[in-house]
Amino acid sequence: DFPAAPDGTPASQDFFTGMPSKCAVGNILYSWNYAYNTENVKGTPKTIKDFFNTKKFPGKRAIYKSALTNLEIALAADGVKMGKGGALIYKRLEEEGGVDRAMNKIKELCTDPNGGCVFWSAGAQPPELLVAGEVVMATGWNGRFFNAEVGENAPIAQVWDGQGLDYEYFALVKGGPDEANAKKALAMMT
């Protein structure tokens, strides 16, 4: 049980959909989106399709070194509508050929002579790769791009089309040490 927000909003109505669950509560909400180097890209990419369009926007892309989010953005770029919470994308991924369709889109990008892929595994890498000019576009986390763009005055701009929302959780082990105080701390942090 969480206390009401300062404005009186009940905790059950004060969290993003799905963040409080029976076992955990979300502590940060962020977006998987992409950004581009404004000095190295001619024109203004606006859609997730633009991320995959190496004819209009030539140059290497940086993508996460996992299927996580790559499959979703590949299908969105291939014309699959997102649906609420990405429901239509996930429905397509569950269907026969859905994963293959997404993987083929990624393979096309990574083997395209006008493009190619650099794979990243740490959140700081996408803005670093963009600023260094190693890639012209990169997928990543909106907060990392924001910090580089605003905090470091990096020449990058974010594109929100096709973004995926994600969150991290706090969880407590039932019957764990000092459970009562752990619950109080969790309530204060959220």
Language-model segments: residues:
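Hydrophobic residues within well-ordered alpha-helices
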Residues: 129-133, 172
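Extracytoplasmic ligand-binding site segments that recognize negatively charged/polar headgroups
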Residues: 1-129
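Structured loop/turn residues at beta-strand edges in well-structured enzyme cores
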Residues: 46, 133, 154
